[in-house]
Structure formats: C-alpha cells, structure tokens
From Swiss-Prot:
Belongs to the protein N5-glutamine methyltransferase family. PrmB subfamily. The keyword S-adenosyl-L-methionine applies. GO terms for cellular component: cytosol. One of its GO terms (molecular function) is protein-glutamine N-methyltransferase activity. GO terms for biological process: methylation. Methylates large ribosomal subunit protein uL3 on a specific glutamine residue. It is an enzyme of class 2 (transferase). Its EC number is 2.1.1.298. It comes from Burkholderia pseudomallei (strain K96243). This is Ribosomal protein uL3 glutamine methyltransferase. The gene is prmB. Keywords: Methyltransferase, S-adenosyl-L-methionine, Transferase. The lineage of its organism: Bacteria, Pseudomonadati, Pseudomonadota, Betaproteobacteria, Burkholderiales. It catalyses: L-glutaminyl-[ribosomal protein uL3] + S-adenosyl-L-methionine = N(5)-methyl-L-glutaminyl-[ribosomal protein uL3] + S-adenosyl-L-homocysteine + H(+). Pfam families: MTS.
Length: 307
C-alpha cells in the first residue's frame, strides 16, 4: 500500500481535495449528484463507511493512513477514468431507497420515480385499487420496485432485453423481498409476456411505465465520458431517439385496461416526441425537471393495434 501524502489528515482535507480534483478534471455529473461537492462528500463518506447524511460531526476526524489511501484511490478513479460514482460504490439511491448497481445496467435516474411517490395521482384515482403494473426496459429494476411500493396490492411484471440487466434487477427485487410480487421477463418489450395478459381483458395492466432508451443519435455522439461506461443499448434511441418509444406506444393499447395509463420518460426529447406523436393526446406531467420529461397517455387515446 502506498504511503499517504502528509497534507491529508481529516475528512475535511479529503473532501476539499476531491472537489478540487473533480473540478480540475472537468467531470460530468448526473449519476446521483449534479455537482463536485455533493459527489465528493458522497464518495468520501461511503468509502469510510460513515453515514451518508452526516458530514459535520466527522469533518475534523483524523483518519488512519489506510483510510486515506482508500479514499484517494476512489477519487483518482473518478477523476482519471471518469467512472460514474455509482459504479465505484456499487449502489444508487432513488427517492430514499438504495439499489445495487454495476456496469451491467445504466445508473438509475428517473423522474417517474418521484411521480410514483404519489402513486401517479391524480391520473390513477386510487393506488390501492391498482392490480397490475408493467415496466418495460426495467434495467436494474428500481422503478418496478418503486411501483410495487406505490401500489401495494399490485403484481408487477418487469421486462428487459438484457439478461445481464435482469440479473441485477433480480438482486434488487430479492433485496426488497418482492420476489412474489415482481416477475422478471427476458425479451424485447412485450414479446416475452404471456399472451393471455392481453387476450383476457381481466388480465390487462392498469399501468404501464417505461424509461426506455431515448437519446437521439446527435446527442449520443456528444455524451460525456461518464456515460460511455453505461450500456449503450440502455441509452441509444435511434436517429430521433424515438425508435423504442414508437414501439412501446404502438402496442400498448392491447395490454392496458380500458381506463389504464401509459407513462413514458423521454429526458430532453420532448420536441422529438411531439414531432413523432403530434396526433396523440399527450399529458405532460410536472416533475422537478419541469413538464417536459415524462408524458402520460390514457388507454383510450392510444392507437388501436392491428391483429
């Protein structure tokens, strides 16, 4: 193990160093924090096994040489390799809930999560009456888990094309003890789901949610290095970002109850959504990012499915 540089003795020293190092490296944020200070505090506290919400009492705590070395190693990996913090710590937080993540999945970040805090009300009249939910492009399974918590009487089906992603989703599902309420399906959007779930109207879903790949080709080419560590298939949405969204909307009607809703997150692609689906009655939902990141469509407004 290397000898710790003498200038670093306390938590305060390491946080200050991390902020300087991250600023010097011109890092991009957006995988759990949006600035150098918050990311520095998180990585320092996590590496030292300290409570993530308690910085002040530990600021002037003197650290052992091996603790300093461990923190410096994490800071350098973040600064030089541009690895997202969540991959370094093997965890991500969403609305107070901790989830396991690694490089097999995109780092979870979704405004649908905050909408689930209120059970999608008022668009869902009573969350306790929701009996079934489908999440497409589940990735690490975070939204499926938040949906199960928001709709306590619902069964949740979660689908992903990546077997690796589903392995991570299984870890999270099992960590929350939801293996009897969340079923995982490996396949392309609706394809792996049992056909009786649309043939029998009683089996159709009350809610479908999706945070699909939606980054358009131009934006993909300009993504910061941090995003290059994530699976490309979880980000890239084709020329206008709408390749997967078109397919989700195109078949959603047959899988939804007559009074069901489809909720889709599209990041900064509102203009492309409106260009592609201008004939549909889209309801843009207010989130902490404004009203241009998540839209809802009532089942009655969705296009009919042939066949």
């Amino acid at each position: 193990m290397t000898t710790s540089p003498t200038p670093f003795k306390t938590v305060r020293d390491l946080v200050r160093h991390a902020v300087s190092r991250f600023s010097q490296a011109k890092l991009a944020f957006g995988h759990g924090s949006d600035n150098a200070f918050d990311e520095a505090v998180y990585l320092v506290l996590h590496t030292l096994h300290l409570p993530l919400d308690t910085l002040e009492p530990f600021l002037d705590a003197r650290l052992a040489p091996d603790e300093i070395d461990a923190v410096l190693a994490v800071i350098e990996r973040r600064a030089t390799e541009r690895v997202p913090a969540a991959y370094l710590t093997r965890e991500a937080w969403m609305h107070g809930h901790r989830f396991y993540v690694d490089e097999r999945v995109i780092v979870p970040r979704s405004f649908i999560g905050e909408l689930l805090d209120d059970g999608l009300q008022p668009y869902v009249e009573d969350p306790e009456l929701v009996g079934s939910v489908l999440e497409l492009c589940t990735g690490s399974g975070c939204l499926a888990i938040l949906a199960a918590l928001a709709f306590p009487n619902a069964s949740v089906d979660a689908v992903d094309l990546s077997a690796d992603a589903l392995a991570v989703a299984k870890i999270n599902r099992d960590n929350y003890g939801l293996d009897e309420r969340i079923a995982l399906y490996h396949g392309d959007l609706y394809a792996p789901l049992p056909q009786f779930k649309w043939i029998d109207p009683a089996q159709r879903y009350d809610v479908i949610i999706a945070n699909p790949p939606y980054v358009n080709a131009g934006s993909m080419a300009e993504l910061p290095a941090e995003y290059r560590h994530e699976p490309e298939m979880a980000l890239a949405g084709g020329a206008d970002g709408m390749d997967i969204v078109r397919r989700i909307i195109g078949e959603a009607r047959r899988w939804l109850q007559d009074d069901g809703v489809l909720v889709v997150e599209i990041g900064n692609e509102r203009a492309n959504v409106e260009a592609a689906f201008g004939g549909l009655e889209l309801v843009w939902l207010p989130t902490s990012a404004g009203d241009g990141s998540v839209f809802l469509i009532h089942a009655s407004e969705l296009p009919a499915v042939a066949g």
